[in-house]
């Protein structure tokens, strides 16, 4: 990736998920980022934010946290956000007078939007420069038809975003 600035940027990748295949998806994205040259750029620090819901599909915490060592070694920081972390964030908002009980529950309660909110909250608290949300049901490939043949092609989603915002 080409940038005029050579300063280090902290990039947050946020996944709001409840799907068992999350780790397979994460592996696909990391292979994609390595292929694009993003991994290995000393000026880009990848920070992973995973807000998971164990009740959505009856999953276990390990379905999200068992990241292979080869991938973990490439991540600057990893934040796993489950019900305990959400309760703590709600408590903080109430304790500091930022939100009452009702609004803390609305902001960080249940559902996809609340998961994205808690990821954003964590990203702000951890000085993330850029945050990109990726869906847990979309792989970094696209299928196109060429003369009656389906072609699978990789897309460099994160690289393209950074080229245009960093």
PLM region spans:
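N-proximal low-complexity "stem/linker" segments adjacent to membrane-targeting elements
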Residues: 1-66, 95-103
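Residue-level preference for long, well-ordered alpha-helices that form the structural scaffold
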Residues: 22, 108, 154-158
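Short alpha-helical segments and helix-capping/turn motifs at coil-helix boundaries
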Residues: 26-36, 114-120, 155-165
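Residue-level detection of beta-strand scaffold positions
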Residues: 49-51, 119, 128
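Active-site-proximal specificity loops/subdomain of glycosyltransferases
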Residues: 57-126
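Short aromatic/hydrophobic "clamp" motif used to bind/position activated sugar donors
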Residues: 131
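Active-site acidic Asp-centered loop
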Residues: 134-137
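Conserved donor-nucleotide/metal-binding helix-loop-beta segment in metal-dependent transferases, i.e.
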Residues: 139-166
